[in-house]
């Protein structure tokens, strides 16, 4: 019932705007102009006659209208709330405004519309099939479907342009394992974990026997509170799994003082406390990971790269305090859609993206700024966002 009242108010506002006059003593009917390219309903106050309304003008091209229309002509489409915004991000009110505009533009009988089914936002409207629009709007459904297709295709081209620039700058992404996106595995972070492990691990691509444990399994992870391996994995921004790379072909065994010739090549470790690895080992490991991990492959890196590239950050995000690493989402759903395109997930939303960002809190890569909506901060284990770091990477 409330939705029907709101829709009625929207239609009333449009009728008031159409039939109102600057002179309260005159209330002539509007002058309508119909173009061959599209129908534009205009209100002309300068050409009104005190004796009555002026008749309808015949078909004109867009260029002819531009030359003949006076400055006082009110274009409803230009004044509407939905202009300048992508249909996917329209609010319920903007959807109603757009439907009202289409009804007036096409001279459609509004009484035949099922108002109870118009209470939807832009994302829901864009997901409606042609048959659904015909069911709700009748013959007008074909016109609405065609207009939506044109509007959404233009906005998709803009997002694709940003993705293309990100890729040209070296921010490539890994294809999913036959999955539609990073958040369809039960947990919103499942695919992100898998991607991170695949990209950072030198074991990726090799095969293991049935009895040999794989990297990241319980046989390779260490236990205890004082082991450097466990604490170091939480400090690293490049990998989301614990790795023991002493068996990797990338690192020769002879280069590490803790290596013993008699250790088995695969299988479970011997009983006892896990061996402690030297600082040189971790320095070498970090160097290898930083060279092989592609840029922009993790969510926090994707956010960082948008912030540090002004040519890509067209009102998507902004720095609140660059020195402290504090930033804010300005168009959160647009950023989520970009991340969804990057991960081949068309159902990505900011709600899912924000849940994925929480995963980085424990690792101190990202921090939430208390009391401020859409505001976050890079943690001590993040990198590549400081001005001096950006300058060094460009040299």
Swiss-Prot record:
Its main location: cytoplasm. GO terms for cellular component: cytoplasm; nucleus. It is found in: Cytoplasm; Nucleus. SMART domains: ETS, SAM_PNT. Keywords: Activator, Cytoplasm, Developmental protein, Differentiation, DNA-binding, Inflammatory response, Nucleus, Repressor, Transcription, Transcription regulation. Residues 69-155 form the PNT domain. It holds the Pfam family SAM_PNT. GO terms for biological process: anatomical structure morphogenesis; blastocyst development; cell differentiation; extracellular matrix organization; inflammatory response; mammary gland involution; negative regulation of DNA-templated transcription; positive regulation of transcription by RNA polymerase II. Residues 246-265 have a biased composition (Basic and acidic residues). GO terms for molecular function: DNA binding; DNA-binding transcription activator activity, RNA polymerase II-specific; DNA-binding transcription factor activity; DNA-binding transcription factor activity, RNA polymerase II-specific; RNA polymerase II cis-regulatory region sequence-specific DNA binding; sequence-specific double-stranded DNA binding. Residues 297-379 bind DNA. It comes from the Eukaryota. Residues 200-275 are annotated as: Disordered. Residues 200-240 have a biased composition (Low complexity). Residues 266-275 have a biased composition (Basic residues). Interacts with TBP. Interacts with CREBBP and EP300; these act as transcriptional coactivators of ELF3 and positively modulate its function. Interacts with XRCC5/KU86 and XRCC6/KU70; these inhibit the ability of ELF3 to bind DNA and negatively modulate its transcriptional activity. Associated with CLND7 and POU2F3. Interacts with ZNF768. Transcriptional activator that binds and transactivates ETS sequences containing the consensus nucleotide core sequence GGA[AT]. Acts synergistically with POU2F3 to transactivate the SPRR2A promoter and with RUNX1 to transactivate the ANGPT1 promoter. Also transactivates collagenase, CCL20, CLND7, FLG, KRT8, NOS2, PTGS2, SPRR2B, TGFBR2 and TGM3 promoters. Represses KRT4 promoter activity. Involved in mediating vascular inflammation. May play an important role in epithelial cell differentiation and tumorigenesis. May be a critical downstream effector of the ERBB2 signaling pathway. Belongs to the ETS family. This is ETS-related transcription factor Elf-3.
């Amino acid at each position: 019932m409330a939705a029907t009242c709101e829709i009625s108010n929207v239609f009333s506002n449009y009728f008031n705007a159409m039939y109102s006059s600057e002179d309260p003593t005159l209330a002539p009917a509007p002058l309508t102009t119909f173009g061959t390219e599209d129908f534009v309903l205009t209100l002309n106050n300068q050409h009104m006659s005190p004796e009555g309304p002026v008749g309808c003008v015949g078909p004109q091209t867009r260029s002819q209208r531009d030359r003949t229309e006076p400055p006082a002509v009110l274009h409803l489409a230009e004044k509407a709330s939905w202009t300048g915004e992508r249909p996917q991000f329209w609010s319920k009110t903007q959807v109603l405004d757009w439907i009202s505009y289409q009804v007036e533009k096409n001279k459609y009988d509004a009484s035949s519309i099922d108002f109870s089914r118009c209470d939807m936002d832009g994302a829901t409207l864009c997901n409606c099939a042609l048959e659904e629009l015909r069911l709700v709007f009748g013959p007008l459904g074909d016109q609405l479907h065609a207009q939506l297709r044109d509007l959404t295709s233009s906005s998709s081209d803009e997002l694709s342009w940003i993705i293309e620039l990100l890729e040209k700058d070296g921010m490539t992404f890994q294809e999913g394992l036959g999955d539609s996106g990073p958040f369809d595995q039960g947990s919103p972070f499942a695919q992100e974990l898998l991607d991170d492990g695949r990209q950072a691990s030198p074991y990726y691509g090799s095969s293991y026997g049935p009895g040999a444990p794989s990297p990241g399994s319980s046989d390779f992870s260490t236990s205890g509170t004082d082991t450097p391996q466990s604490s170091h994995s939480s400090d690293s921004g490049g990998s989301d799994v614990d790795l023991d790379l002493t068996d990797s072909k990338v690192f020769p065994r002879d280069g590490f003082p803790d290596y013993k010739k008699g250790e088995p090549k695969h299988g479970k470790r011997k009983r006892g406390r896990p061996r402690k690895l030297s600082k040189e080992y971790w320095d070498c490991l970090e160097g290898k990971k930083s060279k092989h991990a592609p840029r922009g492959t993790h969510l926090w890196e994707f956010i960082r790269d948008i912030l540090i590239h002004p040519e890509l950050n067209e009102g998507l995000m902004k720095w609140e305090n660059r020195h402290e690493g504090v930033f804010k989402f300005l168009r959160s759903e647009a950023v989520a859609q970009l991340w969804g395109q990057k991960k081949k997930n068309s159902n990505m939303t900011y709600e899912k993206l924000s849940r994925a960002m929480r995963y980085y809190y424990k690792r101190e890569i990202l921090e939430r700024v208390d009391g401020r909506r859409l505001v976050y901060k890079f943690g001590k284990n993040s990198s590549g966002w400081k001005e001096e770091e950006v300058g060094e990477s460009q040299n």
